Amino acid sequence: MAFGAPRGRGGDRGGFGGRGGSRGGFGGARGGRGGSRGGFGGDRGGRGGSRGGFGGDRGGRGGRGGPRGGARGGRGGARGGARGGAKVVIEPHRHAGVFIARGKEDLLVTRNIAPGESVYGEKRISIEEPSKEEGAAPTKIEYRVWNPFRSKLAAGIMGGIDELGIAPGKKVLYLGAASGTSVSHVADVVGPEGMVYAVEFSHRPGRELIGMAKKRPNVIPIIDDARHPQKYRMLIGMVDAVFADVAQPDQARIIALNSHLFLKDQGTVVISIKANCIDSTVDAETVFAREVQKLREERIKPLEQLTLEPYERDHCIVVGRYVRSGLKK
Protein backbone atom coordinates (compact mmCIF):
# COMPACT_ATOMS: atom_id res chain seq x y z
CA MET A 1 0.00 0.00 0.00
CA ALA A 2 1.67 3.13 -1.19
CA PHE A 3 0.60 5.78 1.33
CA GLY A 4 3.58 7.88 0.28
CA ALA A 5 2.69 8.05 -3.41
CA PRO A 6 1.70 11.41 -4.84
CA ARG A 7 -2.02 11.92 -5.06
CA GLY A 8 -4.17 14.11 -7.21
CA ARG A 9 -6.38 14.04 -10.24
CA GLY A 10 -3.60 12.94 -12.53
CA GLY A 11 -1.72 10.61 -10.24
CA ASP A 12 -2.05 7.08 -8.99
CA ARG A 13 -3.80 6.09 -5.83
CA GLY A 14 -3.13 2.65 -4.49
CA GLY A 15 -4.90 2.60 -1.14
CA PHE A 16 -8.50 2.11 -2.09
CA GLY A 17 -7.63 0.41 -5.34
CA GLY A 18 -6.31 -2.41 -3.18
CA ARG A 19 -6.08 -6.06 -3.90
CA GLY A 20 -3.21 -5.67 -6.27
CA GLY A 21 -4.27 -2.62 -8.32
CA SER A 22 -3.89 1.11 -8.52
CA ARG A 23 -6.52 3.75 -9.09
CA GLY A 24 -6.18 6.80 -11.25
CA GLY A 25 -8.35 9.83 -10.78
CA PHE A 26 -10.01 10.98 -13.99
CA GLY A 27 -7.69 9.15 -16.32
CA GLY A 28 -6.05 6.38 -14.37
CA ALA A 29 -6.79 2.76 -13.83
CA ARG A 30 -8.11 0.72 -10.95
CA GLY A 31 -7.06 -2.84 -10.59
CA GLY A 32 -9.81 -4.00 -8.29
CA ARG A 33 -10.29 -7.77 -8.41
CA GLY A 34 -8.17 -8.21 -11.46
CA GLY A 35 -9.66 -5.53 -13.72
CA SER A 36 -8.99 -1.93 -14.53
CA ARG A 37 -11.33 1.02 -14.23
CA GLY A 38 -11.16 4.18 -16.23
CA GLY A 39 -12.76 7.34 -14.97
CA PHE A 40 -14.82 9.22 -17.54
CA GLY A 41 -13.47 7.41 -20.55
CA GLY A 42 -11.75 4.25 -19.44
CA ASP A 43 -12.53 0.62 -18.91
CA ARG A 44 -13.53 -1.21 -15.80
CA GLY A 45 -12.52 -4.77 -15.61
CA GLY A 46 -14.35 -5.64 -12.41
CA ARG A 47 -14.94 -9.44 -12.22
CA GLY A 48 -13.58 -10.11 -15.64
CA GLY A 49 -15.64 -7.80 -17.88
CA SER A 50 -15.10 -4.38 -19.33
CA ARG A 51 -17.35 -1.39 -18.85
CA GLY A 52 -17.21 1.92 -20.62
CA GLY A 53 -17.48 4.88 -18.31
CA PHE A 54 -19.28 8.08 -19.19
CA GLY A 55 -17.75 7.99 -22.64
CA GLY A 56 -19.11 4.57 -23.65
CA ASP A 57 -22.52 3.28 -24.60
CA ARG A 58 -24.50 1.11 -22.28
CA GLY A 59 -25.56 -2.28 -23.52
CA GLY A 60 -28.47 -4.45 -22.63
CA ARG A 61 -28.70 -6.90 -19.76
CA GLY A 62 -25.57 -8.71 -20.65
CA GLY A 63 -24.31 -10.22 -17.40
CA ARG A 64 -21.38 -9.20 -15.26
CA GLY A 65 -18.67 -11.00 -17.14
CA GLY A 66 -19.36 -9.93 -20.71
CA PRO A 67 -18.65 -6.72 -22.56
CA ARG A 68 -21.21 -3.96 -22.19
CA GLY A 69 -20.65 -1.92 -25.26
CA GLY A 70 -23.91 -2.24 -27.19
CA ALA A 71 -26.28 0.61 -27.82
CA ARG A 72 -29.09 0.95 -25.35
CA GLY A 73 -32.46 0.45 -26.93
CA GLY A 74 -34.89 -0.32 -24.12
CA ARG A 75 -37.29 -3.23 -24.52
CA GLY A 76 -37.75 -3.80 -28.18
CA GLY A 77 -36.33 -0.65 -29.72
CA ALA A 78 -36.75 3.06 -29.35
CA ARG A 79 -40.15 4.29 -28.29
CA GLY A 80 -40.77 6.38 -31.36
CA GLY A 81 -40.55 3.57 -33.90
CA ALA A 82 -39.73 -0.01 -34.62
CA ARG A 83 -37.13 -1.25 -37.03
CA GLY A 84 -38.62 -1.85 -40.45
CA GLY A 85 -37.18 -2.13 -43.92
CA ALA A 86 -36.01 -5.53 -45.06
CA LYS A 87 -36.36 -7.14 -41.63
CA VAL A 88 -40.14 -6.64 -41.39
CA VAL A 89 -42.69 -7.96 -43.87
CA ILE A 90 -46.20 -6.50 -43.91
CA GLU A 91 -49.00 -8.95 -44.71
CA PRO A 92 -52.71 -8.14 -45.03
CA HIS A 93 -54.96 -9.51 -42.30
CA ARG A 94 -58.18 -11.30 -43.25
CA HIS A 95 -60.00 -8.17 -42.02
CA ALA A 96 -59.56 -5.50 -44.69
CA GLY A 97 -57.53 -2.50 -43.56
CA VAL A 98 -55.72 -4.45 -40.83
CA PHE A 99 -52.20 -5.81 -41.33
CA ILE A 100 -49.67 -8.12 -39.66
CA ALA A 101 -46.02 -7.11 -39.34
CA ARG A 102 -43.90 -10.26 -39.60
CA GLY A 103 -40.49 -9.88 -38.00
CA LYS A 104 -38.77 -10.88 -34.80
CA GLU A 105 -42.29 -10.90 -33.36
CA ASP A 106 -45.63 -10.70 -35.16
CA LEU A 107 -47.52 -7.46 -34.54
CA LEU A 108 -51.00 -6.24 -35.39
CA VAL A 109 -50.67 -2.94 -37.29
CA THR A 110 -52.72 -0.39 -39.22
CA ARG A 111 -51.52 1.92 -41.96
CA ASN A 112 -50.98 5.36 -40.42
CA ILE A 113 -53.28 7.92 -42.01
CA ALA A 114 -51.17 10.68 -40.41
CA PRO A 115 -47.52 9.62 -40.99
CA GLY A 116 -45.06 10.75 -38.36
CA GLU A 117 -47.71 11.09 -35.66
CA SER A 118 -48.32 8.69 -32.77
CA VAL A 119 -51.36 8.92 -30.50
CA TYR A 120 -50.42 7.03 -27.32
CA GLY A 121 -46.69 6.36 -27.71
CA GLU A 122 -47.22 3.31 -29.91
CA LYS A 123 -44.40 2.02 -32.09
CA ARG A 124 -44.32 2.93 -35.75
CA ILE A 125 -42.87 0.84 -38.56
CA SER A 126 -41.73 2.40 -41.83
CA ILE A 127 -41.62 0.20 -44.90
CA GLU A 128 -40.30 1.11 -48.33
CA GLU A 129 -42.41 -0.20 -51.17
CA PRO A 130 -41.14 -0.14 -54.76
CA SER A 131 -42.80 2.48 -56.92
CA LYS A 132 -45.13 1.37 -59.71
CA GLU A 133 -43.38 3.78 -62.08
CA GLU A 134 -40.11 2.56 -63.50
CA GLY A 135 -37.08 4.45 -62.21
CA ALA A 136 -39.02 6.28 -59.48
CA ALA A 137 -37.90 6.29 -55.87
CA PRO A 138 -39.54 3.76 -53.53
CA THR A 139 -42.53 4.92 -51.51
CA LYS A 140 -42.24 4.98 -47.73
CA ILE A 141 -45.35 3.77 -45.89
CA GLU A 142 -45.77 4.00 -42.12
CA TYR A 143 -47.69 1.52 -39.97
CA ARG A 144 -48.73 1.83 -36.32
CA VAL A 145 -48.67 -1.09 -33.89
CA TRP A 146 -52.16 -1.83 -32.53
CA ASN A 147 -51.77 -2.96 -28.93
CA PRO A 148 -54.49 -5.46 -27.87
CA PHE A 149 -53.87 -4.59 -24.21
CA ARG A 150 -54.88 -0.99 -24.96
CA SER A 151 -57.77 -1.61 -27.34
CA LYS A 152 -60.81 -3.89 -26.94
CA LEU A 153 -61.25 -4.01 -30.70
CA ALA A 154 -57.65 -5.15 -31.23
CA ALA A 155 -58.14 -7.76 -28.49
CA GLY A 156 -61.17 -9.07 -30.37
CA ILE A 157 -59.20 -9.29 -33.62
CA MET A 158 -56.39 -11.13 -31.86
CA GLY A 159 -58.99 -13.49 -30.37
CA GLY A 160 -60.24 -14.44 -33.84
CA ILE A 161 -63.41 -12.40 -34.32
CA ASP A 162 -65.11 -13.44 -37.58
CA GLU A 163 -66.93 -10.25 -38.54
CA LEU A 164 -65.66 -6.77 -37.78
CA GLY A 165 -67.97 -4.51 -39.79
CA ILE A 166 -65.15 -1.97 -40.08
CA ALA A 167 -63.37 -1.81 -43.43
CA PRO A 168 -61.91 0.78 -45.85
CA GLY A 169 -64.53 3.29 -46.98
CA LYS A 170 -67.00 2.46 -44.19
CA LYS A 171 -68.70 4.96 -41.90
CA VAL A 172 -68.48 4.02 -38.22
CA LEU A 173 -70.15 5.39 -35.09
CA TYR A 174 -67.86 4.86 -32.10
CA LEU A 175 -69.54 5.22 -28.67
CA GLY A 176 -67.23 5.65 -25.68
CA ALA A 177 -64.28 7.01 -27.65
CA ALA A 178 -62.29 8.12 -24.55
CA SER A 179 -59.02 9.79 -25.58
CA GLY A 180 -59.04 8.22 -29.04
CA THR A 181 -56.64 5.29 -28.70
CA SER A 182 -58.84 2.79 -30.58
CA VAL A 183 -60.56 5.49 -32.62
CA SER A 184 -57.26 6.44 -34.25
CA HIS A 185 -56.76 2.85 -35.43
CA VAL A 186 -60.34 2.64 -36.70
CA ALA A 187 -59.62 5.83 -38.64
CA ASP A 188 -56.58 4.10 -40.15
CA VAL A 189 -58.71 1.09 -41.12
CA VAL A 190 -61.54 3.02 -42.82
CA GLY A 191 -59.00 5.25 -44.55
CA PRO A 192 -59.50 8.68 -46.13
CA GLU A 193 -62.68 7.52 -47.93
CA GLY A 194 -64.33 6.45 -44.66
CA MET A 195 -65.48 8.36 -41.60
CA VAL A 196 -65.47 7.80 -37.83
CA TYR A 197 -67.95 9.63 -35.60
CA ALA A 198 -66.44 9.45 -32.11
CA VAL A 199 -68.76 10.18 -29.17
CA GLU A 200 -67.31 10.81 -25.70
CA PHE A 201 -69.07 12.30 -22.68
CA SER A 202 -66.14 13.15 -20.36
CA HIS A 203 -64.46 16.45 -21.16
CA ARG A 204 -60.94 15.57 -20.05
CA PRO A 205 -60.40 12.64 -22.45
CA GLY A 206 -62.54 14.58 -24.90
CA ARG A 207 -59.81 17.23 -25.17
CA GLU A 208 -57.30 14.56 -26.14
CA LEU A 209 -59.81 13.14 -28.62
CA ILE A 210 -60.16 16.55 -30.27
CA GLY A 211 -56.37 16.90 -30.42
CA MET A 212 -56.10 13.55 -32.17
CA ALA A 213 -58.90 14.44 -34.60
CA LYS A 214 -57.11 17.62 -35.69
CA LYS A 215 -54.50 15.46 -37.41
CA ARG A 216 -57.00 12.94 -38.81
CA PRO A 217 -59.60 14.58 -41.05
CA ASN A 218 -61.75 11.43 -41.17
CA VAL A 219 -62.53 11.63 -37.41
CA ILE A 220 -65.39 13.80 -36.16
CA PRO A 221 -65.23 14.15 -32.35
CA ILE A 222 -68.54 14.67 -30.54
CA ILE A 223 -68.38 15.59 -26.85
CA ASP A 224 -71.85 14.68 -25.69
CA ASP A 225 -73.88 12.06 -23.82
CA ALA A 226 -74.53 8.95 -25.91
CA ARG A 227 -77.77 8.45 -23.94
CA HIS A 228 -79.24 11.37 -25.90
CA PRO A 229 -78.34 10.79 -29.55
CA GLN A 230 -80.94 13.29 -30.72
CA LYS A 231 -78.62 16.06 -29.49
CA TYR A 232 -76.02 15.26 -32.14
CA ARG A 233 -78.26 13.81 -34.85
CA MET A 234 -77.52 16.76 -37.15
CA LEU A 235 -73.79 15.82 -37.17
CA ILE A 236 -74.11 12.17 -38.17
CA GLY A 237 -75.48 10.53 -41.30
CA MET A 238 -76.33 6.87 -41.69
CA VAL A 239 -73.44 4.60 -40.71
CA ASP A 240 -72.40 1.07 -41.65
CA ALA A 241 -71.31 -0.05 -38.17
CA VAL A 242 -71.65 0.91 -34.52
CA PHE A 243 -68.91 0.08 -32.03
CA ALA A 244 -69.67 0.61 -28.34
CA ASP A 245 -67.36 0.59 -25.33
CA VAL A 246 -69.37 2.65 -22.86
CA ALA A 247 -69.13 0.38 -19.77
CA GLN A 248 -72.47 1.51 -18.31
CA PRO A 249 -75.28 -0.55 -16.71
CA ASP A 250 -77.71 0.63 -19.42
CA GLN A 251 -75.32 0.18 -22.33
CA ALA A 252 -77.74 -2.05 -24.26
CA ARG A 253 -80.29 0.78 -24.26
CA ILE A 254 -77.60 3.31 -25.28
CA ILE A 255 -76.57 1.14 -28.22
CA ALA A 256 -80.18 0.57 -29.27
CA LEU A 257 -81.04 4.28 -29.27
CA ASN A 258 -78.05 5.13 -31.46
CA SER A 259 -78.63 2.17 -33.78
CA HIS A 260 -82.29 3.11 -34.35
CA LEU A 261 -81.24 6.63 -35.38
CA PHE A 262 -78.03 6.10 -37.34
CA LEU A 263 -77.39 2.46 -38.30
CA LYS A 264 -78.32 1.17 -41.75
CA ASP A 265 -80.46 -1.91 -42.18
CA GLN A 266 -78.27 -5.04 -41.90
CA GLY A 267 -75.56 -2.88 -40.33
CA THR A 268 -73.03 -4.34 -37.90
CA VAL A 269 -73.07 -3.77 -34.13
CA VAL A 270 -69.91 -4.54 -32.14
CA ILE A 271 -70.16 -4.24 -28.36
CA SER A 272 -67.54 -4.60 -25.66
CA ILE A 273 -69.18 -5.77 -22.43
CA LYS A 274 -67.52 -5.37 -19.04
CA ALA A 275 -69.40 -7.59 -16.60
CA ASN A 276 -68.49 -5.72 -13.41
CA CYS A 277 -69.82 -2.42 -14.75
CA ILE A 278 -73.25 -3.92 -15.40
CA ASP A 279 -73.80 -6.21 -12.40
CA SER A 280 -71.04 -7.18 -9.99
CA THR A 281 -73.29 -9.48 -7.91
CA VAL A 282 -73.46 -12.32 -10.46
CA ASP A 283 -70.90 -14.15 -12.55
CA ALA A 284 -69.73 -12.75 -15.87
CA GLU A 285 -71.43 -15.41 -18.03
CA THR A 286 -74.84 -14.53 -16.58
CA VAL A 287 -74.28 -10.83 -17.30
CA PHE A 288 -73.25 -11.57 -20.88
CA ALA A 289 -76.36 -13.71 -21.47
CA ARG A 290 -78.65 -10.98 -20.13
CA GLU A 291 -77.06 -8.33 -22.35
CA VAL A 292 -77.38 -10.52 -25.43
CA GLN A 293 -81.09 -11.00 -24.70
CA LYS A 294 -81.53 -7.22 -24.36
CA LEU A 295 -79.92 -6.77 -27.77
CA ARG A 296 -82.34 -9.30 -29.30
CA GLU A 297 -85.26 -7.27 -27.97
CA GLU A 298 -83.85 -4.20 -29.77
CA ARG A 299 -83.74 -5.93 -33.20
CA ILE A 300 -80.02 -6.71 -32.98
CA LYS A 301 -79.44 -10.34 -33.96
CA PRO A 302 -76.33 -11.75 -32.20
CA LEU A 303 -73.85 -13.41 -34.56
CA GLU A 304 -70.94 -14.25 -32.29
CA GLN A 305 -69.64 -13.79 -28.76
CA LEU A 306 -65.96 -13.85 -27.90
CA THR A 307 -64.08 -13.54 -24.61
CA LEU A 308 -61.29 -10.95 -24.43
CA GLU A 309 -59.05 -13.10 -22.24
CA PRO A 310 -56.09 -12.83 -21.72
CA TYR A 311 -56.12 -9.13 -22.66
CA GLU A 312 -59.07 -8.12 -20.48
CA ARG A 313 -60.59 -9.88 -17.50
CA ASP A 314 -64.37 -10.49 -17.36
CA HIS A 315 -64.85 -8.84 -20.74
CA CYS A 316 -66.45 -10.14 -23.90
CA ILE A 317 -67.15 -8.75 -27.33
CA VAL A 318 -70.48 -9.37 -29.05
CA VAL A 319 -71.11 -8.90 -32.77
CA GLY A 320 -74.66 -8.51 -34.03
CA ARG A 321 -76.65 -7.65 -37.15
CA TYR A 322 -79.19 -4.82 -36.96
CA VAL A 323 -82.52 -5.53 -38.66
CA ARG A 324 -84.69 -2.44 -39.04
CA SER A 325 -87.85 -4.26 -40.09
CA GLY A 326 -87.85 -6.52 -37.02
CA LEU A 327 -85.82 -9.47 -35.82
CA LYS A 328 -86.10 -12.34 -38.26
CA LYS A 329 -86.58 -15.77 -36.75
Curated annotation (Swiss-Prot):
Residues 13-84 have a biased composition (Gly residues). Belongs to the methyltransferase superfamily. Fibrillarin family. It is an enzyme of class 2 (transferase). InterPro entries: Fibrillarin, Fibrillarin_CS, SAM-dependent_MTases_sf. GO terms for biological process: box C/D sno(s)RNA 3'-end processing; regulation of transcription by RNA polymerase I; snoRNA guided rRNA 2'-O-methylation. Keywords: Methylation, Methyltransferase, Nucleus, Ribonucleoprotein, RNA-binding, rRNA processing, S-adenosyl-L-methionine, Transferase. One of its GO terms (cellular component) is small-subunit processome. Its EC number is 2.1.1.-. This is rRNA 2'-O-methyltransferase fibrillarin. Residues 1-85 are annotated as: Disordered. Its main location: nucleus. S-adenosyl-L-methionine-dependent methyltransferase that has the ability to methylate both RNAs and proteins. Involved in pre-rRNA processing. Utilizes the methyl donor S-adenosyl-L-methionine to catalyze the site-specific 2'-hydroxyl methylation of ribose moieties in pre-ribosomal RNA. Site specificity is provided by a guide RNA that base pairs with the substrate. Methylation occurs at a characteristic distance from the sequence involved in base pairing with the guide RNA. It is found in: Nucleus, Nucleolus. It catalyses: L-glutaminyl-[histone H2A] + S-adenosyl-L-methionine = N(5)-methyl-L-glutaminyl-[histone H2A] + S-adenosyl-L-homocysteine + H(+). Coiled coil: none annotated. Component of box C/D small nucleolar ribonucleoprotein (snoRNP) particles that contain SNU13, NOP1, SIK1/NOP56 and NOP58, plus a guide RNA. NCBIfam families: PRK04266.1-2. Gene3D superfamilies: Phosphorylase Kinase, domain 1 (3.30.200.20), Vaccinia Virus protein VP39 (3.40.50.150). One of its GO terms (molecular function) is histone H2AQ104 methyltransferase activity. It comes from Debaryomyces hansenii (strain ATCC 36239 / CBS 767 / BCRC 21394 / JCM 1990 / NBRC 0083 / IGC 2968) (Yeast). By homology to other fibrillarins, some or all of the N-terminal domain arginines are modified to asymmetric dimethylarginine (DMA).
